[in-house]
A protein has these predicted regions:
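A general structural motif
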Residues: 8-12, 60, 121
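Ordered, amphipathic secondary-structure segments that act as subunit-interaction surfaces
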Residues: 59-104
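Short, ordered loop/turn segments at secondary-structure junctions
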Residues: 33-36, 61-63, 85, 105-108, ...
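Short amphipathic alpha-helical segments and helix-helix/interface helices
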Residues: 46, 88-92, 129-130
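Structural motif
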Residues: 2-5, 27-30, 55-57, 77-80, ...
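Glycine-rich, aromatic-bearing surface loops/beta-hairpins
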Residues: 94, 99-156
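Short, hinge-like loop/turn segments at secondary-structure boundaries
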Residues: 47-49, 75, 119
Length: 156
């Protein structure tokens, strides 16, 4: 069962490892990231970083989409992590049954507009996000579980 879908350019780091995995009782983390899926060193580093009792899978976006039927059958409490909005939007659209997406960290870049202290979106990312919003997906910004959710749907 998917407990959390999060966009965070840092992928697996302290906030995710200590705060989110505990608050959501996460048993499996699925990282969907095209670059990471082909980087053996980064995959090994992520496996060493994750909590010992949590399973970890790393897939490209297309591979993850091909595995959607199997992901839907998993009984673990799952967190899905993306490093960027584009890959998240592609997967969430294909999955079809994701109600919420947490925007945890999207870095500042040329042409990006600031939506919170840690979330900056380009016009293309705003458009991707608006498409998800139009499909009924609630998008929110929240760094850690103890902080208040900021509803991104109201800002885009």
């Amino acid at each position: 069962m998917i407990k959390l879908v999060r966009v965070d350019h840092r992928l697996l780091h302290g906030q995710v490892i200590f705060a989110w995995t505990k608050s959501e009782d996460i048993e499996r983390i699925i990282i969907i990231d095209d670059k990471t899926s082909t980087d053996d060193f980064k995959k090994m580093s992520l496996k060493l970083t994750k909590p010992e009792d949590v399973k970890l899978n790393v897939f490209s976006t297309n591979k993850a989409i091909s595995l959607i039927p199997r992901i839907k059958e998993l009984t673990d409490n799952i967190m899905i992590l993306f490093s960027n909005v584009k890959e998240m939007s592609k997967f969430v659209t294909a999955y079809g049954d994701i109600k919420e997406v947490n925007y945890g960290g999207v870095p500042n870049r040329d042409g990006a507009k600031q939506y919170s202290e840690a979330v900056f979106l380009t016009p293309e990312e705003v458009e991707e996000s608006q498409n998800l919003k139009a499909k009924g997906v609630m998008l929110y910004i929240q760094q850690v579980p103890s902080r208040r959710k900021e509803i991104l749907n109201e800002k885009i």
